[in-house]
């Protein structure tokens, strides 16, 4: 009977579904595994990147389920967001309709691949119940001071007409639509992620060896902790009159280089610069260039060519008394430190680049024979008055102490990370649950009034926020004074939704109506044991999720410190050397692959083509090869003896049979390491192929039966449909359990030993593994007799199971 993928796959998907085979068990005393792949945005169809992500997660979920773990393997949809509004404009369809139609189609696609997701815990973040408890979290955070309002410069996308977080600006462009981003001053709500900066940084230690080093480094750099000196510099008298300021604050991490300062660089937003602008003391050219810098995002400023303009004013060095020129520069950020940076060109690459460009002084204060800039934090100080000849670290501490003693400076800790602006001027998002009252100010909604849902009778035009234009939706009564008020019309950044969905999944779905998180079940299931997703989320979703975990812990909802124990960042799927995209015309449709070859073939190719963390190059021939392997497996299984296993005795097997059995058990042994640790599924599949090839040379019915019993067990998480079909036919699926190794299989009958004379290999021989040391040495001498003739042996060395070395003279 030929292999018919479609019939087999539909049969088993129906059985699994009807028997709720993949739902987590209620017994919270069982050992658990929570396997989660990052949930998708419902764009309409899944792509091969999705297939790879969810196949990896599904393999692990199936494996742990098979060996007796209680497994939670959920899926949902990150369903709020701007693309739904763009689709509404383009296709004249309501964002909600577009979103839920896409969800329905993508669910069908996902389950056609045999993914073992829990259907009962499926959710969409645009569901009213999800919104209700997200709004509850917002209010609780607001009441605790973790969310506040302020007016600030924000990244504004003119195309999407909304605010973007710093992390959502890529090379000066919107991460979603690619449009230029400008700076705009607006009021908004901010999440105080900086309150957890120290803990977010410290707890990265707990994730070492469990998260990719690249992700840990990216988060560490984004948090950007720096310890240093904050100190005051007085302005000279003429500069005081111009700026209406007497001094300025400066932050530095290199107090040891303070005598090397040759200029002070200010952010364009610094009050001294703004005072000069307001008094028209800067020429029009400088004014125009400052405006250009102000419209750049922080990331764009950091990455662009260093530019600056002399302001015509000076500060006085607090120790040497020298005059230091003040410049405005594009690389200084207003909200990092004090918005003013002391520049030491001799010992900082950026400062050196700037000083060289504008012909500014370069003062060396650390002794070195190397070319400048010398940026190492080691060496003896020079040209630093009483601190000469001190090493950098000692000088740094003494200089800071002197500043503190004179009361002109202090030790401070700064972080690069900024509070997270979450207000978005769009319709398709979770409404911010706040009220604006002319009497009471900003007031939270009452919890019993949640969820605050979106009106459906809106016009999506792409111009401004539809909620602002709705004739009645904003109108409400202030819960504090009872007077007429207005609802907040901004909606939440969609990263707010994806920052806690993993905890909602961990909560028993039977409690979803009543509470955000069920204490008992989240305590059992959290943290996620294995999280899987793209590295592009390293400083977006992954950092926000870590913050949310800690904030919800402190609000009493959760108990764990970290949301994800282990993280795997899978590589991209490429075709013709490039990421798949419609514009490049290199997209492979998963539906077409499933229809032609079946889901198991798609899964096998995805896992065999490359290790999960590496990029995967799509190859049509390799897909054909995966299909042929499954057909061959299916065909060979038709000749395997059915029923109970016949016990095999190792001593009764011939050499070829022992070798084939060894290869089967080596594959089983490898499966333990691959499924538990390395995830090198390609090597495991190769080991199974090698075992089957060795088995083909044998004519032992009992051996073939045992081999299929084991190999179908190993491959079931990878190609589940065909393995269930064959295992049911041959073994009534009794092989789907935790299997044990048989040590006697690994005991070799013979040893292959090398013989060296004076360290140089001269011969090899095979001998019984039961031979004594004396027998082995005698055999070694016999095999090297011609090199020993006329020589005397002064030493005999036997490295057990490996080699013999004879020392002669």
Swiss-Prot record:
Its main location: cytoplasm. It catalyses: tRNA(Leu) + L-leucine + ATP = L-leucyl-tRNA(Leu) + AMP + diphosphate. GO terms for biological process: leucyl-tRNA aminoacylation. Keywords: Aminoacyl-tRNA synthetase, ATP-binding, Cytoplasm, Ligase, Nucleotide-binding, Protein biosynthesis. Pfam families: Anticodon_1 (PF08264), tRNA-synt_1_2 (PF13603), tRNA-synt_1g (PF09334). Its EC number is 6.1.1.4. The keyword Nucleus does not apply. GO terms for molecular function: aminoacyl-tRNA deacylase activity; ATP binding; leucine-tRNA ligase activity. It is an enzyme of class 6 (ligase). CDD domains: Anticodon_Ia_Leu_BEm (cd07958). One of its GO terms (cellular component) is cytosol. It is found in: Cytoplasm. The keyword Aminoacyl-tRNA synthetase applies. A motif ('KMSKS' region) lies at residues 579-583. A motif ('HIGH' region) lies at residues 40-50. ATP binds at residue 582. InterPro entries: aa-tRNA-synth_I_CS, Leu-tRNA-ligase, Leu_tRNA-synth_edit, M/V/L/I-tRNA-synth_anticd-bd, Methionyl/Leucyl_tRNA_Synth, Rossmann-like_a/b/a_fold, tRNAsynth_Ia_anticodon-bd, Val/Leu/Ile-tRNA-synth_edit. Belongs to the class-I aminoacyl-tRNA synthetase family. NCBIfam families: leuS_bact (TIGR00396). This is Leucine--tRNA ligase. The gene is leuS.
């Amino acid at each position: 009977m030929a292999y018919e993928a479609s019939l087999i796959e539909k049969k088993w998907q129906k059985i699994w579904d009807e028997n709720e085979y993949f739902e987590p068990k209620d017994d919270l005393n069982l050992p658990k595994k929570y396997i989660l792949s990052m949930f998708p945005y419902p764009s309409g169809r899944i792509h091969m990147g999705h297939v790879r992500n969810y196949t990896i997660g599904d393999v692990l979920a199936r494996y742990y389920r098979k060996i007796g773990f209680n497994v939670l393997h959920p899926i949902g949809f990150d369903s709020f967001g701007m693309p739904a509004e763009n689709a509404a404009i383009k296709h004249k369809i309501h964002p909600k309709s577009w979103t839920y139609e896409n969800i329905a189609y993508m669910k069908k696609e996902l389950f056609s691949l045999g993914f073992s997701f829990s259907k009962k815990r499926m959710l969409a973040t645009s569901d009213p119940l999800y919104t209700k408890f997200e709004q509850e979290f917002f209010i609780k955070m607001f009441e605790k001071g973790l969310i506040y309002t302020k007016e600030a410069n924000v990244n504004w996308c003119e195309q999407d007409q909304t605010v973007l977080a710093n992390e959502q600006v890529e090379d000066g462009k919107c991460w979603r639509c690619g449009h230029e981003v400008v700076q705009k001053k607006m009021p908004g709500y901010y999440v105080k992620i900086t309150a957890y900066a120290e803990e977010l940084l410290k707890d990265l230690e707990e994730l070492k060896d469990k998260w990719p080093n690249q992700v840990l480094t990216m988060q560490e750099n984004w948090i950007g902790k720096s310890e240093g000196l904050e100190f005051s510099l007085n302005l000279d008298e003429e500069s005081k009159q111009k700026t209406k300021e007497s001094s300025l604050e400066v932050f530095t991490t290199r107090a040891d280089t303070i005598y090397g300062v040759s200029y002070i660089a200010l952010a364009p937003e610094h009050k001294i610069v703004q005072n000069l602008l307001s008094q028209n003391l800067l020429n029009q050219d400088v004014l125009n260039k400052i405006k250009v810098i102000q419209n750049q995002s922080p990331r764009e400023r950091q990455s662009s060519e260093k530019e600056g303009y002399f302001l015509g004013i000076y500060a006085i060095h607090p120790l040497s008394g020298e005059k230091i020129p003040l410049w405005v520069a594009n690389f200084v950020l207003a909200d990092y430190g004090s918005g003013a940076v002391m520049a030491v060109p001799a010992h900082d690459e950026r400062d050196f680049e700037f000083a060289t460009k504008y012909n500014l002084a370069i003062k060396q204060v650390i002794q070195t024979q190397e070319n400048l800039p010398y940026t190492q934090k080691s060496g003896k100080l020079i040209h630093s008055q009483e601190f000469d000849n001190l090493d950098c670290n000692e000088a740094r501490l003494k200089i800071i102490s002197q500043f503190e003693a004179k009361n002109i400076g202090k030790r401070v800790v700064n972080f690069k990370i900024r509070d997270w602006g979450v207000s978005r001027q769009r319709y398709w998002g979770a409404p911010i649950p706040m009220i604006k009252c002319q009497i009471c100010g900003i007031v939270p909604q009452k919890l019993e009034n949640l969820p605050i849902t979106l009106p459906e009778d809106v016009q999506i035009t792409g111009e401004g926020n539809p909620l602002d234009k709705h004739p009645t939706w904003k109108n409400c009564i202030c819960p504090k004074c009872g007077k007429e008020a207005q609802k907040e019309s901004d909606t939440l950044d969609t990263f707010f939704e994806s920052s806690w969905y993993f905890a909602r999944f961990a909560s028993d779905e039977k409690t979803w109506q009543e509470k955000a998180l069920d204490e008992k079940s989240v305590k059992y299931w959290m943290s996620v044991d294995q999280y899987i997703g793209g590295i592009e989320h390293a400083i977006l979703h992954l950092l926000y999720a870590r913050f949310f975990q800690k904030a919800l812990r402190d609000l009493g909802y959760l108990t764990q410190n970290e949301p994800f124990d282990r993280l795997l960042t899978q590589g991209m799927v490429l075709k013709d050397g490039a990421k798949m995209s419609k514009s490049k015309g290199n997209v492979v449709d998963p539906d077409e692959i499933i229809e032609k070859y079946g889901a198991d073939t798609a899964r096998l190719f995805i896992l065999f083509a490359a290790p999960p963390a590496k990029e995967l190059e799509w190859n049509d021939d390799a897909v054909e090869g995966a299909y042929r392997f499954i057909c061959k497996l299916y065909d060979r299984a038709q000749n395997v003896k059915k029923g109970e296993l016949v016990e095999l005795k190792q001593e009764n097997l011939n050499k070829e049979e022992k070798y084939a059995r060894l290869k089967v058990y080596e594959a089983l042994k490898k499966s333990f390491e691959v499924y538990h640790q390395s995830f090198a599924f390609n090597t495991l599949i190769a080991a199974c192929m090698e075992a089957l090839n060795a088995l083909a040379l044998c004519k032992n019915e009992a051996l073939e039966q045992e081999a299929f019993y084991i190999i179908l067990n190993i491959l079931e998480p990878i190609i589940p449909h065909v393995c269930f079909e064959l295992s049911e036919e041959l073994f009534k699926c009794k092989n789907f359990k935790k299997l044990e190794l048989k040590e006697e299989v690994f005991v070799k009958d013979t040893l292959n030993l090398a013989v060296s004379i004076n360290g140089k290999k001269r011969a090899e021989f095979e001998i019984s593994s039961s031979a004594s040391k004396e027998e082995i040495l005698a055999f070694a001498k016999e095999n090297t007799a011609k090199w020993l003739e006329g020589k005397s042996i002064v030493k005999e060395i036997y490295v057990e199971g490996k080699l013999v070395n004879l020392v002669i003279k």
